[in-house]
């Protein structure tokens, strides 16, 4: 056919239906959609190889192998050309085998009696012995229409298959299944040689019409046993019996077409030097002749001693094959498989595909007549898997593919064993995750996630930051003692990982030099601290401070002459306002001596006591400066007595604390104060520090300069800081580009106890951060990034917390209350920190909350405005102004920006704003009462109470309640109508009569009391 062949055309050519071809293509691994689909040439060739060489079926008509109904003595003779051809056909021109399955096989020679064919009447017991086939392959075969006389109708149905105990005696009159058939003369058959018959390469013929279903119920009567003898009519075959016609498996290459006899190796002349008795030199196999054997896949395995199968079909004389019934054939199937000599199984089958030799219950695999081993059949039939042969392409089933796919998607099991600690101590940083915990105990993080979920009831991922409480509870659960590393220890470990250290003892080989003392001036607000420093420095810093109060930490170095020697002294000025507690604490930590300033006219105040506590906590000596001694009402002795209660005893009272009376305004006794500072430093302190090492110190203050960028005021504590050094301070790092002293002059290096302003940081350091010089910029950047990550993890752990029922309810309540969002911008980091702490301490009630969503140092930028617009926040600028077009953007976005220069003004305004956001509180105020004297029924209105106002005023549209016998009958009513006689009234005063309508409420009786009231707002305190 031209072009590609279609499935239905191939089915027509092969003589089978399209479903059979589609099924065969599917078995071959070729998936074709429908009968009208085209098939490629290689697939056609493979398909034809899988089918037997019967390219076309005979002309129409009833198949000759189907016996007619009735109980006649013998079956009807087959029609020429319609009988099935189970075996290879002879060469065209020679008479080929035409015996149908319903007729007996013609004897090929008198000395070679053949076995009964399937469906043929069995001969008498002497004649029922298996007869060998003809010894010569050149003997002419008999006519296809020759039928021997029927001797018994009982054997017409053939031997009934069925299991039989192994090793039992065979029934008389038939060959024992599984045993070799003896040749004539009683001699044992010779073993097959290498040139003997071998398994056939193709499966046996299969009927063209449905009928080989092994599960079809037979419609014919029960067949008699194979051991019965006698003559009788042949019983009709069951619906499942094989019918003649083409069978699956394409024609073999070179096979002739339909209609002519097929060439048979048995009909060819013997090869020279071959043995007599069979083609190829091998003696013919006993059991009669037969065509190609059915495929072993079409049979169910049978025990070795099973009953014999159905008799095989007749075949050309001289061909090895099954004349007798092959063991193990299922009823309704094809002929039995031929049993090879010496192999267990049934009797010689009528020929079939290459079944597995030696399989229990079946005959040996069919072999070709000529020498040489044939290919084993691989096609799986309806009765079992294919036989041994060349392995075909293996395809995974859909179930196997799905299981493989699902196994790939299967999540890793988290049920791994978690090691127990047995009291072992492990150290974890703040905000550590379960992955960090797992690294410490060498466990699977997924297992810890499961433990936290199942035993602690928390849903935490492996990389999520956990609170300290969660980590400690997990440690108790697993038997570990979890120690949360403090920030100081964590930072120390971080520096040690880079072979760095901060602080520590000096080595013996380190050269120490004298350094100036660091003096911190502390005290209550407005007690004259900055004015005293101005007197020492001969400057006027107070005039530059907004509101006359110090809001920054200032560091200065002055030179004082004591006993003729000029001694440098470093002064640090701290704010005295209560909001700058953190600044005072930092000032006390970095100082050598604390000068406590107390006003002689004001005495000891709260911030005075706080500053004293900071100094005592830092363990530094204290010098008391009693200021404002020139004012009226000054009492320095009172100050000495008050401070005695806090452990500061003056020298004149027998103590060790130096008290100096000074006047900062008049610059009185300033030299005495400096002398007291130097004497205290020399007596109590070892003022030496190394100068040849890398610089280390503390950042006192930080700010963002518009032209210079981040600027940090640092105090060098050891070593020498030089321009070009790589430094890291907290989460900020950079390279020193320039250094400025307190007067704004450029300096190239700064030794111990020298305060300088450093330019070159990438961001503004926080006040109080330690700074140190590192070998290179890369190390500084890595240290800063790790500190940022550590701080971020700690903040995340604190913000998340444990999701318990209480916290969920609290968050729901927070969602209901009003919140004020703020963005803080200041000139220096210390001021921003102080402002944030002060604002967060404001408490006006649970209904309103304060949230600071961002804070920073420097001018107000457009980014701050956009963030405030997105979060409905107010921008607070402390000593800063907008930058660029931030003002225009704020006006366009409707963002409110407030500017402050004094911190307590900002605190007061924010507190008032929070109070204004409180929800109003209402209380009930009684307006008046009216007594019901009469009840009138008004159409379309209802009952109207004719009343007398007893007290107050009755107003229309006010709330009312009805009281009967002192009991409230109805509440939350409304005075919908109010009339004075026939006129509508807005209000009726005491002593007047009126008509009151309460809307749809009509349960009004005489002597009831109508009380009116309203809700009035109560001012919040």
From Swiss-Prot:
Its main location: cytoplasm. Residues 627-630 are annotated as: G4. Residues 75-95, 113-129, 198-208, 234-254, 262-273 have a biased composition (Pro residues). Residues 548-552 are annotated as: G2. GO terms for molecular function: GTP binding; GTPase activity; translation initiation factor activity. Residues 573-576 are annotated as: G3. GTP binds at residues 523-530, 573-577, 627-630. Residues 663-665 are annotated as: G5. Residues 514-686 form the tr-type G domain. Keywords: Cytoplasm, GTP-binding, Initiation factor, Nucleotide-binding, Protein biosynthesis. CDD domains: IF2_eIF5B, IF2_mtIF2_II, mtIF2_IVc. Residues 57-71, 275-291, 306-389 have a biased composition (Gly residues). It is found in: Cytoplasm. Residues 390-401 have a biased composition (Basic residues). Gene3D superfamilies: 1.10.10.2480, P-loop containing nucleotide triphosphate hydrolases, Translation factors, Translation initiation factor IF- 2, domain 3. Residues 50-422 are annotated as: Disordered. One of its GO terms (cellular component) is cytosol. Residues 523-530 are annotated as: G1. Residues 96-112, 130-159, 167-178, 187-196, 219-233 have a biased composition (Low complexity). It comes from the Bacteria. One of the essential components for the initiation of protein synthesis. Protects formylmethionyl-tRNA from spontaneous hydrolysis and promotes its binding to the 30S ribosomal subunits. Also involved in the hydrolysis of GTP during the formation of the 70S ribosomal complex. HAMAP family: IF_2_B. Belongs to the TRAFAC class translation factor GTPase superfamily. Classic translation factor GTPase family. IF-2 subfamily. This is Translation initiation factor IF-2. The lineage of its organism: Bacteria, Bacillati, Actinomycetota, Actinomycetes, Frankiales. The gene is infB.
């Amino acid at each position: 056919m031209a072009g590609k062949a279609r499935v239905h055309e191939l089915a027509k050519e092969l003589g089978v239906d399209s479903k059979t071809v589609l099924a065969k293509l599917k078995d071959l691994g070729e998936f074709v959609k429908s009968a009208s689909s085209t098939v490629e040439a290689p697939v056609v060739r493979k398909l034809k190889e899988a089918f037997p060489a019967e390219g076309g079926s005979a002309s129409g008509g009833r198949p000759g192998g189907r016996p007619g109904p009735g109980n006649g003595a013998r079956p009807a003779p087959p029609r020429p050309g319609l009988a099935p051809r189970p075996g290879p056909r002879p060469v065209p021109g020679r008479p080929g085998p035409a015996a149908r399955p319903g007729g007996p096989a013609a004897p090929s020679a008198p000395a070679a009696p053949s076995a009964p064919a399937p469906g043929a009447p069995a001969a008498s017991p002497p004649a029922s012995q298996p007869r060998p086939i003809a010894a010569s392959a050149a003997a002419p075969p008999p006519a296809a229409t020759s039928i021997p006389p029927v001797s018994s109708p009982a054997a017409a149905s053939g031997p009934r298959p069925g299991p039989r105990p192994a090793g039992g005696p065979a029934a008389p009159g038939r060959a024992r299944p599984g045993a070799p058939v003896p040749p004539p003369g009683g001699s044992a058959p010779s073993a097959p040689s290498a040139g003997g018959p071998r398994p056939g390469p193709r499966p046996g013929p299969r009927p063209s019409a449905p009928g080989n279903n092994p599960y079809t119920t037979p419609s014919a009567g029960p067949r008699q046993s194979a051991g019965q003898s006698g003559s009788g009519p042949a019983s009709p075959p069951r619906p499942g019996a094989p019918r003649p016609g083409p069978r699956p498996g394409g024609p073999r290459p070179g096979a002739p077409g339909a209609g002519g006899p097929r060439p048979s190796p048995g009909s060819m002349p013997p090869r020279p030097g071959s043995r007599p008795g069979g083609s190829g030199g091998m003696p013919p196999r006993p059991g009669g002749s037969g065509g190609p054997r059915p495929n072993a896949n079409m049979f169910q395995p049978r025990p070795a001693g099973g009953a014999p199968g159905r008799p095989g079909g007749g075949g050309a004389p001289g061909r090895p094959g099954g004349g007798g019934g092959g063991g193990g054939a299922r009823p309704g199937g094809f002929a039995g498989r031929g049993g090879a000599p010496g192999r267990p199984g049934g009797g010689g089958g009528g020929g079939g595909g290459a079944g597995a030799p030696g399989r229990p219950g079946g005959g040996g695999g069919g072999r070709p007549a000529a020498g040489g081993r044939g290919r084993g059949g691989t096609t799986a039939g309806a009765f079992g898997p294919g036989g041994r042969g060349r392995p075909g392409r293996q395809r995974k089933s859909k179930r196997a593919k799905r299981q493989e796919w699902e196994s790939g998607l299967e999540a890793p099991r988290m049920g791994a064993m978690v090691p127990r600690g047995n009291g072992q101590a492990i150290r974890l940083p703040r905000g550590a995750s379960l992955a960090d915990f797992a690294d410490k105990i060498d466990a699977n993080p997924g297992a810890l996630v499961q433990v936290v979920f199942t035993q602690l009831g928390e849903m935490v991922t492996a990389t999520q930051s956990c609170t300290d409480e969660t980590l400690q509870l997990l440690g108790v659960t697993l038997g570990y003692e979890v120690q949360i590393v403090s920030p100081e220890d964590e930072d120390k470990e971080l520096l040690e990982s880079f072979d760095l250290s901060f602080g520590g003892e000096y080595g013996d080989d380190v050269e120490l030099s004298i350094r100036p003392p660091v003096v911190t001036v502390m005290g209550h607000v407005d007690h004259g601290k900055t004015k005293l420093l101005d007197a020492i420095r001969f400057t006027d810093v107070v005039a530059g401070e907004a509101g006359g109060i110090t809001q920054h930490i200032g560091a200065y170095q002055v030179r004082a002459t004591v006993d003729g020697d000029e001694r440098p002294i470093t002064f640090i000025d701290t704010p005295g306002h209560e909001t700058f507690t953190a600044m005072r604490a930092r000032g006390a930590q970095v100082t050598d001596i604390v000068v406590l300033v107390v006003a002689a006219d004001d005495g000891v105040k709260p911030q005075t006591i706080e500053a004293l506590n900071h100094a005592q906590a830092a363990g530094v000596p204290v010098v008391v400066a009693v200021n404002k001694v020139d004012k009226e009402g000054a009492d320095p002795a009172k100050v000495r007595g008050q401070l005695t209660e806090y452990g500061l005893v003056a020298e004149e009272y027998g103590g060790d604390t130096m008290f100096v009376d000074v006047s900062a305004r008049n610059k009185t006794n300033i030299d005495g104060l400096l002398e007291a500072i130097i004497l205290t430093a020399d007596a109590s302190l070892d003022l030496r520090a190394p100068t040849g090492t890398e610089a280390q110190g503390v950042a006192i203050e930080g700010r963002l300069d518009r032209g210079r960028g981040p600027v940090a005021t640092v105090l060098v504590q050891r070593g020498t800081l030089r321009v070009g050094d790589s430094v890291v301070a907290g989460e900020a790092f950079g390279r020193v580009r320039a250094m400025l002293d307190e007067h704004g002059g450029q300096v190239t290096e700064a030794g111990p106890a020298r305060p300088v302003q450093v330019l070159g940081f990438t961001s503004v350091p926080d006040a109080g951060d330690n700074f140190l010089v590192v070998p290179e910029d890369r190390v500084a950047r890595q240290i800063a990034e790790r500190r940022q990550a550590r701080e971020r993890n700690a903040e995340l752990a604190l913000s998340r917390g444990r999701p318990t029922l209480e916290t969920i309810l609290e968050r729901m309540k927070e969602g209901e209350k009003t919140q004020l969002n703020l963005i803080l911008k200041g000139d220096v980091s210390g001021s921003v920190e102080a402002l944030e702490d002060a604002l967060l301490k404001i408490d006006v009630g649970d209904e309103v909350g304060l949230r600071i969503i961002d804070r920073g140092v420097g001018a107000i930028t457009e980014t701050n405005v956009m963030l405030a617009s997105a979060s409905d926040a107010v921008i607070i600028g402390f000593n800063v102004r907008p930058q660029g077009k931030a003002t225009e953007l704020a006006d366009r976005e409707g963002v409110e920006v407030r500017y402050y220069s004094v911190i307590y003004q900002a605190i007061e305004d924010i507190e008032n704003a929070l109070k204004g956001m409180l929800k109003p509180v209402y209380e009930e105020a009684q307006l008046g009462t009216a007594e019901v004297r009469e009840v009138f029924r008004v159409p379309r209105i209802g009952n109207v109470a004719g009343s007398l106002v007893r007290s107050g005023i009755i107003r229309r549209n006010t709330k009312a309640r009805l009281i009967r016998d002192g009991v409230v009958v109805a509440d939350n009513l409304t005075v919908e109508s109010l009339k004075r006689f026939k006129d509508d009234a807005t209000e009726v005063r005491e002593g007047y009569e009126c008509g009151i309508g309460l809307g749809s409420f009509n349960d009004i009786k005489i002597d009831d009391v109508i009380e009116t009231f309203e809700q009035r707002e109560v001012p919040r305190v």
